[in-house]
Amino acid sequence: MISYPFFSLSPPGLVPPPMAVPPVEMYSGSFWNRMRKPLPLRTQVIRFTVVFVIVSFILAVALQITHERMPDPKVTKPLPDLGFELLTKISFLSVVTDVLIAFLSSLSFFTLWKLYLLHRHCVGSGEPELPCNIPGVSRFFLSVWLCKENCRIELRNVHTIAWIRFITSYALLLLFRSLVIVMTSMPTPVDKCQNPPKIENPVKNVILTVLTAGGGSIHCGDLMYSGHTVILTLHLMFHWIYGAMVHWSFRPVVTVVAIFGYYCIVASRSHYTDDVLVAIYLTIATFIAVGHNADGAPWQLQLFIRWLPCCGANSREVTEDSQPVMVAFKSEAVDELRERDDSAGLSCEVSTNEV
């Protein structure tokens, strides 16, 4: 065998095999600049909402797997829990938790509507009008509410950015929960799951889980961490930041409702105390990490939706919610023409350009 010096690339006349060379632009600054360029806010709203629906189906499948893997309640008893020892068991409070979540969801949509009105007021669009004026009702729903003491955020597109922040945080938390509930199966303390029903139609159960947010489907054993606590805390964070911009009372009201909801979850034995505590921490940390940004979601999250072939454009051809501005150009030549026309009894009209 012929040996070559260590510094020899190849023997004379030997052509090395072709190698796949990645495009230069993949490693260039221009490529990553394009990847970090923010998507239009409208595109983010649509695509992140689609992603949330997909994540909801993933969670529904995970709930079904967890239901089948749950330890037999007749063999494995619930784990010792300090919250269960301190709080008296009140089973019907699980229904109260759902009512509290429905109330906070309605309040959040109302706040989002008021944020949209603030955006319209900021861009000079004015208040919308109903086809028929209803005394009191029209003023309540269509008037602009603003608490200046708590308003430290740019009002333009605030409703869109708030929705993107909420829905991306919720999708991340549900996706992580889908993984966690499948990994470790714990004995359930829930009364209705002590004799868990058999799932006869898995596909129907998955669809019902998505359509009813879990209320109309069969699922047991999804303990770590609490989904009810996630949505309660998300509403709490949403109103702590954005609700306070609309009215000062939203912060204390939502805080009291959320704390009472945590109590209902533990007192009804729907979750262990650790399920609630971990969910509170993860939700607050995720909401803060996503943050409020004029470009919408962090660019790392936008990478996951940039490749979708539908649901909006990837570039901002026109500035969103832009308003036409009239600019008048004045020059000495125009002044001279105006003086000549005035002296001749003619009128000279200064042209304006819309940019």
Curated annotation (Swiss-Prot):
The active site is at 228, 271, 275. Residues 66-89, 187-205, 273-275 are extracellular. Keywords: Kinase, Lipid metabolism, Membrane, Sphingolipid metabolism, Transferase, Transmembrane, Transmembrane helix. One of its GO terms (cellular component) is membrane. It is found in: Membrane. GO terms for molecular function: ceramide cholinephosphotransferase activity; kinase activity; sphingomyelin synthase activity. InterPro entries: Sphingomyelin_synth-like (IPR045221), Sphingomyelin_synth-like_dom (IPR025749). It comes from the Eukaryota. It is an enzyme of class 2 (transferase). Disulfide bonds: none annotated. The chain crosses the membrane at residues 45-65, 90-110, 166-186, 206-226, 252-272, 276-296. One of its GO terms (biological process) is sphingomyelin biosynthetic process. Residues 1-44, 111-165, 227-251, 297-355 are cytoplasmic. Its main location: membrane. Its EC number is 2.7.8.-. It is a multi-pass membrane protein. Belongs to the sphingomyelin synthase family. Bidirectional lipid inositolphosphotransferase capable of converting phosphatidylinositol (PI) and ceramide to inositol-phosphorylceramide (IPC) and diacylglycerol (DAG) and vice versa. Direction is dependent on the relative concentrations of DAG and ceramide as phosphoinositol acceptors. Does not function strictly as a SM synthase. Essential for viability of the pathogenic bloodstream stage of this human protozoan parasite and, consequently, can be considered as potential drug target. This is Phosphatidylinositol:ceramide inositolphosphotransferase. It comes from Trypanosoma brucei brucei (strain 927/4 GUTat10.1).
